[in-house]
C-alpha cells in the first residue's frame, strides 16, 4: 500500500499511452457471446489474477489441454496505466479496483476502512506497489508444518521461486553490487525483478544508521535470503524496460493459443453434478442484469478469485458453514464452517517526520511524458525512496507471546515512501491534528507495519446475490497484542530518526505529534490512524488432509469435493514477514506442478 500520487484522468493516461502495444499468445474475448462454441475446455480458471494466470500459463505447456480464464475486470491491455511503475499509487480506488470497504471496526472507534483489491487482468500483480519479498524461512517452514506439505518448506520452495524469477539490472543499467546477493536469485524465469534505486541523500543517511544502531537496524545485503532482519535495498517486479512485470505481462505473454481469456465477466457460482460433491461447472455473467452462462470443465475448475471473492463464490455455490448458508437461503452441499474465516492481514500506520532533506516531489504529467518518450525518469522507478527495514522486537516487548513464525522473522516493517510537501490526503484519518503546512518545510513519509497480526477476521455474505459485496471484517486490533506491537514499531522508527546520522535534518514526528509518547496516547493515535496494508490471506486456508479445520488440502483441492481446487492468496494460512505477492506466485507455481502431475 502506497500513498496515492496526484490523481490523473485515466482517459488522458490512455491517450498518452495510445501507442503502447501489448502482445501475447493467449486469445482474449471481451464478451461471453464471443467465446467459440466448438472448444471444450479441460480447465476453467475462475479469476485471472496473480495466481490464476500462473496456473493457466503452466497448464498451457501441455498442448493437448485447452484452458479458459474468466476475469471480472478488463484486460490490462485496456488499462495501460497499470504498466507504468510510477502510477502504482494512483491505482487504488480507480477503475481497476473493486473498491471494497470493511464493516466498522470496533477497536478503531467504528471506522470502516478502504480495502483495495484489483479488478483487472493480472490481479494485484497489475495493481500493487510491485515490492518483491519472499517472506522468511520461518514462514515457509511453518506453512509446511501446519499444512502438512513439506514441499512448501524453505529448502524445497526456494528453487521454485528462483525458477519463476528473472532478475536483471534496471533500465538505467546501474550496478547492483552491494544491493543484492546474486546467488539468491533466478535469472531465466518469467517474472522480471530489479533493484532499481535513485541517488538521494536519504540513502546515505540510512546506511549510516545501520552502523550506529546495528543491533536494531543492521544492514541486510539481500532482503530475500530468508532471514529478513535489517535495512535492505528494495526489489521490485519491474522489467529492464522500466515497465511493471505482472502475471499478465510475464506469464500470459508467454502462453500459447490454447489459453482463452474472457474478460469483463464475473464468476458467480460453481455447480456440482446433481447437487453432489463433483464441482466442474462454472456460472458467469457480465453483470447482474445480464444472462448467466454455464460452462463445464472436462478435468477441473481452478478457483482463483482472491482472498475476498473466492470464499464468496464458494459460499454462493453451497460450500460453507451450514448455519451461515441457511441464513442467506443457500442450500448447503458441503458443510465447512472454515470457509471465509481466518482472514489474516497486516495493520499499518503512516508516520510523518519534519525534515529539511530535499523533497522527492515531481511533476506527474511531465514525468509521464518522459517515461512514455524514453522509459526513464521518476515514473520508471518503483518508489521515490529505495529501502525497506525489518525490525525484530526484543522479547521483553512481546509480553511473553511471540506472534511471528520464528526467531529469524521480524515483527515490524518500515516502508519509506517519499519526502514531500504534501500532507496525507483529505480522506486520511485525521482525528489527530495534522501539522500546519506553513510550519514545516517537508515531511518524510513512511509506513510502519505490524507483519503478524494475532487478530483474524472474516468474510460473510449479506445475502445470496453474487454481485453484492460481502461483509469484510478485518477484526483489526481485536487482540491487544496487535496494537502493542505496532506501538513499539512507532517507537522503533522514532529511534531510527533520532540517530546521529539524522540529527541535523530530521526534527521529530509531526504525525503523530512529538508529544504523543505514552502507551495510552500512542494507542489512541493508532486507533484513529491505523489502516490495512491490503495483504489479506487465509480465508480458504490450506490444512492437512483429514484435518477438522481449513478449506483446501495440500493438493489445493477443496475438502470433500472433486473437480475443484483453489489457488490464490486465500489458501495461504497467514500473512508472511513481508508483502504477499511472491508467496502467491510461489503457491501458484507449486499448485501448477501438482495439478499437472495428477494427470501424468
From Swiss-Prot:
The gene is pdh3. Its cofactor is FAD. This is Pyranose dehydrogenase 3. Binds 1 FAD covalently per subunit. Catalyzes the single-oxidation or sequential double oxidation reaction of carbohydrates primarily at carbon-2 and/or carbon-3 with the concomitant reduction of the flavin. Accepts only a narrow range of electron acceptors such as substituted benzoquinones and complexed metal ions and reacts extremely slowly with O(2) as acceptor. Monomer. The lineage of its organism: Eukaryota, Fungi, Dikarya, Basidiomycota, Agaricomycotina. SUPFAM superfamilies: FAD-linked reductases, C-terminal domain (SSF54373), FAD/NAD(P)-binding domain (SSF51905). It comes from the Eukaryota. GO terms for cellular component: extracellular region. Its EC number is 1.1.99.29. The modification Tele-8alpha-FAD histidine is found at residue 127. Induction: Constitutively expressed, but on a much lower level than phd1 (only 4.8% of the amount of transcript). Belongs to the GMC oxidoreductase family.
